Amino acid sequence: MSTTSAINGNHYEQLHQGRTNMYKSKVNVVLGAQWGDEGKGKVVDMLASEVDIVCRCQGGNNAGHTVVANGTEFDFHLLPSGVVNEKCISVIGNGVVIHLPSLFDEVLKNEAKGLQQLENRLIISDRAHLVFDFHQQVDGMQEAEKGGKSLGTTKKGIGPAYSSKATRNGIRVGELLGDFNLFSEKFKSIVNTHLRLFPSIKVDVDAELARYKDYVDKVRPYVKDTICFLHTALRNGKTILVEGANAAMLDIDFGTYPYVTSSNCSIGGVLTGLGLPPQTIGEVIGVVKAYTTRVGDGPFPTEQLNEIGDLLQTRGFEIGVTTKRKRRCGWLDIPLLKYTSLVNGYTCICLTKLDILDTLPEIKVGVNYKRSNGEKLDHFPGTISELSDIEVEYAVLPGWQTSTEHIRNFKELPENAQNYVRFLESQLSVPVRWVGVGKGRESIINVH
């Protein structure tokens, strides 16, 4: 090797090492591994007591998280679940779309339950896009037009807001805090665009502008450049936790399209929704419910339209936090979990709501997908038509038929309950680190 090459090589190594060592801490991520409602909020609440910053990276108030802290039940839609920890900073990242009236309504409701000093603990990205009331009107109209082929949207305006973002006529939080005349011009322009496409929507432009002028001073204390804030925090060794909204099977790219949400709720959305490079990611925690649920329409291979589905729905109190709709229920689906693990790269799993299975004499787990001709699939179907042509092959495991609700040590769980957990581990080749057997954070068992 020439002297010049050696110098260049050493220079590269030094630069590479410098970049690698630039961050003194890692970002840990909590992601839903199914169709949402897995209990991510409770997991984040448990982990938030040990971190400095908790972030939301995508979605809007179409997501719903319930956290029980000190006997009080908090419902969050836009706020990260970490806000219940008063020592923690909560960040709403650039990938989130924000309906300001809903955000402040959520703040007031949770302050009434005891949440305090949010102004000092909540940061909103200046690059996050705004959801307006007309986005919500459009969402409802588009859903109604689909008739019997509706997608089951929450009608919160999330899809139309992301559409505005993609077509480059959306408005960001930072623009609201700048020159209000420019904001007004942009608002009138986006309203006119939507009126041309949807003439029946009702928008009082002057009233809306007056309302948003009032929001300027209310939202200003929360807003800053979250990208710079997070990178500075990592360089200073601050611990960061990201709370994914929705779940992998609702991802716009990897979910059961078109029965999906409008954002990337897999690992990629964490990076783009917060402005983080891949090397900052540490643990990726997949949250898996011990059975499967889904809100709204769309394919659901292991769904049980029988007494088992009814029992899971009743015992699990499967009602959507955001929609208040009953969730569809079915058995655990291994092919689905293998697929989302492939996409997200889970380093460990938190298995939730194991106690809901306590009364069952036997428990089925979907282990293979087969076509109607008997051929086994080695992949998760990419189209709805392909997915509708599959049959599920089940493994039957013995139940434990005793309450696990008050157990706090993994080795004290009934043997068959432990075997259920180990079966999931062996199928996915991913360790189960925690098991949930109740509502509160104290009901999460550390397996190891």
Swiss-Prot record:
Protein residues bound to Mg(2+): 37, 64
Swiss-Prot/TrEMBL cofactor(s): Mg(2+)
Major localization listed first in the record, in broad terms: cytoplasm
Cofactor note: Binds 1 Mg(2+) ion per subunit.
Assigned EC number: 6.3.4.4
Gene3D superfamilies reported in the protein's UniProt record: Adenylosuccinate Synthetase, subunit A, domain 1, Adenylosuccinate Synthetase, subunit A, domain 2, Adenylosuccinate Synthetase, subunit A, domain 3
InterPro entries assigned to the protein according to its UniProt record, in alphabetical order: Adenylosuccin_syn_GTP-bd, Adenylosuccin_syn_Lys_AS, Adenylosuccinate_synth_dom1, Adenylosuccinate_synth_dom2, Adenylosuccinate_synth_dom3, Adenylosuccinate_synthetase, P-loop_NTPase
Keywords: Cytoplasm, GTP-binding, Ligase, Magnesium, Metal-binding, Nucleotide-binding, Purine biosynthesis
CDD domains given in the database record: AdSS
Pathway(s): Purine metabolism; AMP biosynthesis via de novo pathway; AMP from IMP: step 1/2
MF annotations from Gene Ontology: adenylosuccinate synthase activity; GTP binding; magnesium ion binding
Compartments (UniProt record): Cytoplasm
Catalytic reaction equation(s): IMP + L-aspartate + GTP = N(6)-(1,2-dicarboxyethyl)-AMP + GDP + phosphate + 2 H(+)
Record-annotated disulphide pairs: none
Coiled coil segments of this chain: none
Binding-site residues for GTP, renumbered to this chain: 36-42, 64-66, 327, 353-355, 436-438
GO cellular component, as recorded: cytoplasm
Active site: 37 (proton acceptor), 65 (proton donor)
Name of a matching Pfam family: Adenylsucc_synt
Binding site for IMP: 37-40, 62-65, 154, 168, 246, 261, 325
Annotated family: Belongs to the adenylosuccinate synthetase family.
Subunit comment: Homodimer.
Name of the protein this chain belongs to: Adenylosuccinate synthetase
Origin species: Drosophila mojavensis (Fruit fly)
Phylogenetic classification of the source organism: Eukaryota, Metazoa, Ecdysozoa, Arthropoda, Hexapoda
